[in-house]
């Protein structure tokens, strides 16, 4: 019996020894190379099973990166850094917001970077323009250009930036589009960063305007203003002599003013430069501000950024809070529902002396103006 137990023990020891030898001589499992680790890491960033990254992920990797061959760990980190950099906006550039309110500055902007076009007609030179030159234009003559249809020596003495458009003085869509065409061409020639159009019944708060425009890079596609409708306008686009089709788009009303970046304005060239703006306006048979919206939204696919900081006489201006006047980009005056329509502000002037309230607003924004009463209470 002892001999039998001894043989069993010997066989067990021999078997264990053979098993150890087999384990030692077998090839070890390959250690993942840095490249493989890099690919696995990139796949994990992209999501499980090669799926798309989660919406809003700032570390999302370009699918093209995943198909590249990674030859070293340093290359992997290089690709990862590049992917994160590409996913983030450039320094100082925030993602576009739709509310049209100022955001952190995207670029440094000065008054000489902005081209303000004021559309008017000869019969309103005294009734409307004199008020503008007395108030906001007096501080910003170098950046403000008057587009009119009639010569005026008195106006020429006030500023050298008077542009005779050779357009009709009628308030027709053809005449309005004619003036807008001249405005566009003069802006392109100026080389300035921003084009802003206003009417001769608008007050422009330059500080608020610069603060708003500085929120957007002028090289990007930016069309900002305030629509007068609560829905896109429906129009008929004439494709050929006998063929039309429906088209709808948003547009910023010219009565409140609007601004366009140079980057977008250059893209508008095929439909706006030279005599093209007039022919484009005829395709939809709508006025100038509608034609701008048609080119930008319907043809170029750039959405209007709607801003509540622009105001026209088509809205109830009494609802603009006095405490927020310094934030508004444009104001207006006129009639609304058969009543006098202007912002509500106490100011140093009576409603009879200052029916538009522009003088009171100007003294509120620029109390150092020589003709503003020093003891004014707002």
Swiss-Prot record:
A soluble form may be derived from the membrane form by proteolytic processing. Gene3D superfamilies: 3.90.550.50. Residues 85-108 are annotated as: Disordered. The record marks 85-86 as: Cleavage. It is found in: Golgi apparatus; Golgi apparatus membrane. The active site is at 289. Optimum temperature is 37 degrees Celsius. Residues 1-8 are cytoplasmic. Residues 30-378 are lumenal. Mn(2+) binds at residues 201, 313. Glycans are attached at residue 166. The chain crosses the membrane at residues 9-29. Detected at 12.5 dpc in all tissues examined with the highest level observed in adult brain and spleen. Detected in the dental epithelium. Changing residue 187 to L: Unable to modulate Notch signaling in a cell-based assay. Loss of acetylglucosaminyltransferase activity. Does not localize to Golgi apparatus. No effect on protein expression. Manganese is the most effective. Can also use cobalt with lower efficiency. Has some activity with magnesium and calcium, but not zinc. Its cofactor is Mn(2+); Co(2+). It is a single-pass type II membrane protein. The keyword Disulfide bond applies. It catalyses: 3-O-(alpha-L-fucosyl)-L-threonyl-[EGF-like domain protein] + UDP-N-acetyl-alpha-D-glucosamine = 3-O-(N-acetyl-beta-D-glucosaminyl-(1->3)-alpha-L-fucosyl)-L-threonyl-[EGF-like domain protein] + UDP + H(+); 3-O-(alpha-L-fucosyl)-L-seryl-[EGF-like domain protein] + UDP-N-acetyl-alpha-D-glucosamine = 3-O-(N-acetyl-beta-D-glucosaminyl-(1->3)-alpha-L-fucosyl)-L-seryl-[EGF-like domain protein] + UDP + H(+). Its EC number is 2.4.1.222. GO terms for molecular function: metal ion binding; O-fucosylpeptide 3-beta-N-acetylglucosaminyltransferase activity. Disulfide bonds join 167-178, 196-259, 363-372. Optimum pH is 5. Belongs to the glycosyltransferase 31 family. This is Beta-1,3-N-acetylglucosaminyltransferase lunatic fringe. It comes from Mus musculus (Mouse). The lineage of its organism: Eukaryota, Metazoa, Chordata, Craniata, Vertebrata.
């Amino acid at each position: 019996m002892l001999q039998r137990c001894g043989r069993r023990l010997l066989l067990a020891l021999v078997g264990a020894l053979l098993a150890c030898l087999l384990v030692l001589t077998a090839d070890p499992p390959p250690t993942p190379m840095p490249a493989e680790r890099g690919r696995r890491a990139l796949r994990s960033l992209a999501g499980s099973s090669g799926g798309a990254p989660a919406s809003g992920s700032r570390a999302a990797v370009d699918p093209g990166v995943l198909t590249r061959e990674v030859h070293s760990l340093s290359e992997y980190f290089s690709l990862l850094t590049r992917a994160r950099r590409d996913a983030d906006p450039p320094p100082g550039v925030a993602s576009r917001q739709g509310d049209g309110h100022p955001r952190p500055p995207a670029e440094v902007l000065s008054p000489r970077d902005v081209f303000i076009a004021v559309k008017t007609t000869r019969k309103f030179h005294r009734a409307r323009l004199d008020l503008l030159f007395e108030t906001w234009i007096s501080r910003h003559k170098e950046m403000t250009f008057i587009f009119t249809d009639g010569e005026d020596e008195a106006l020429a003495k006030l500023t050298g930036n008077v542009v005779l458009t050779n357009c009709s003085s009628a308030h027709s869509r053809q005449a309005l589009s004619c003036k807008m065409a001249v405005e566009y061409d003069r802006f392109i020639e100026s080389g300035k960063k921003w084009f802003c159009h206003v009417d001769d019944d608008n007050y422009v708060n330059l500080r608020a305007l610069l603060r708003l425009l500085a929120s957007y890079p002028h090289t990007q596609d930016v069309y900002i203003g305030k629509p007068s409708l609560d829905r896109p306008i429906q129009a008929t686009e004439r494709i050929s002599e006998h063929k039309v089709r429906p088209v709808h788009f948003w547009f910023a009303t010219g009565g409140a003013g609007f601004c366009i970046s140079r980057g977008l304005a250059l893209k508008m060239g095929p439909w706006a430069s030279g005599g093209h703006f007039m022919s484009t306006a005829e395709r939809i048979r709508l006025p100038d501000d509608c034609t701008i919206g048609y080119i930008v939204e319907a043809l170029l696919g750039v959405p209007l950024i709607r801003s509540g900081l622009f105001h026209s006489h088509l809205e109830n201006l009494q609802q603009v809070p006095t405490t927020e006047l310094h934030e508004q980009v444009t104001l207006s005056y006129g009639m609304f529902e058969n009543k006098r329509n202007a912002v509500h502000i106490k100011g140093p002037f009576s409603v009879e002396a200052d029916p538009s309230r522009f003088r009171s607003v100007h003294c509120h924004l620029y109390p150092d103006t020589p003709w503003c009463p020093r003891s004014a209470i707002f």
